[in-house]
């Protein structure tokens, strides 16, 4: 059985092999290590690279008085990359990634808002890791207690469990080959 790190690395390898030219949003101020050729003011080619230091959740955990499931910290603390367009059982998913340390801080701010919303709604705490491409309101989330990967609508509870673990879910995701940068 693969570790989560091995599953993440294997997915990144499949992605690089199957999507030889990758595009992402260009944020000039970030000076991201993934950036390659700048296509235009909003678009850049990218190549994934390992984070020199994993995204640190300690301050957020302290502020929210909670611990995040280890799979969440591992997913967002391993690679810098553009978001990954994936196919999961015939459904296109955008798996969120961080492009740089600055983007990681932005992600932590967004996670904070999501957790506070869940608490206000008295729902189990989840962390979003992706979006359903068919509908922006459909989130791919990790249940913070169990680590299960599932689907939920914004503001609702997880309604469909896709996998009991992130590693198993990632092993079943395949790169979605895009035909051009505007796909």
From Swiss-Prot:
CDD domains: Syd. Keywords: Cell inner membrane, Cell membrane, Membrane. The keyword Disulfide bond does not apply. It is a peripheral membrane protein. Its main location: membrane. InterPro entries: Syd (IPR009948), Syd_sf (IPR038228). It is found in: Cell inner membrane. It comes from the Bacteria. The keyword Disulfide bond does not apply. GO terms for cellular component: cytoplasmic side of plasma membrane. Interacts with the SecY protein in vivo. May bind preferentially to an uncomplexed state of SecY, thus functioning either as a chelating agent for excess SecY in the cell or as a regulatory factor that negatively controls the translocase function. Belongs to the Syd family. This is Protein Syd. The lineage of its organism: Bacteria, Pseudomonadati, Pseudomonadota, Gammaproteobacteria, Alteromonadales. The gene is syd.
């Amino acid at each position: 059985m693969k570790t989560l790190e091995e599953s993440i690395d294997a997915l990144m390898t499949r992605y690089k092999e199957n999507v030889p030219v990758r595009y992402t949003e260009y944020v000039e101020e970030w000076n991201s290590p993934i950036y390659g050729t700048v296509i235009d003011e909003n678009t850049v080619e990218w190549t994934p690279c390992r984070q020199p230091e994993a995204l640190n959740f300690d301050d957020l955990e302290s502020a929210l008085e909670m611990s995040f499931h280890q799979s969440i910290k591992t997913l967002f603390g391993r690679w810098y990359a553009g978001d990954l367009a994936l196919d999961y059982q015939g459904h296109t998913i955008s798996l969120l990634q961080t492009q740089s340390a600055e983007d990681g801080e932005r992600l932590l701010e967004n996670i904070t808002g999501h957790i506070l919303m869940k608490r206000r709604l008295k729902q189990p705490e989840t962390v979003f890791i992706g979006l359903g491409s068919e509908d922006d309101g459909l989130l791919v989330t990790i249940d913070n207690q169990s680590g299960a990967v599932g689907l939920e609508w914004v503001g609702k509870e997880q309604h469909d469990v896709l996998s009991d673990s992130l590693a198993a879910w990632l092993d079943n995701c395949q790169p979605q080959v895009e035909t051009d940068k505007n796909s």
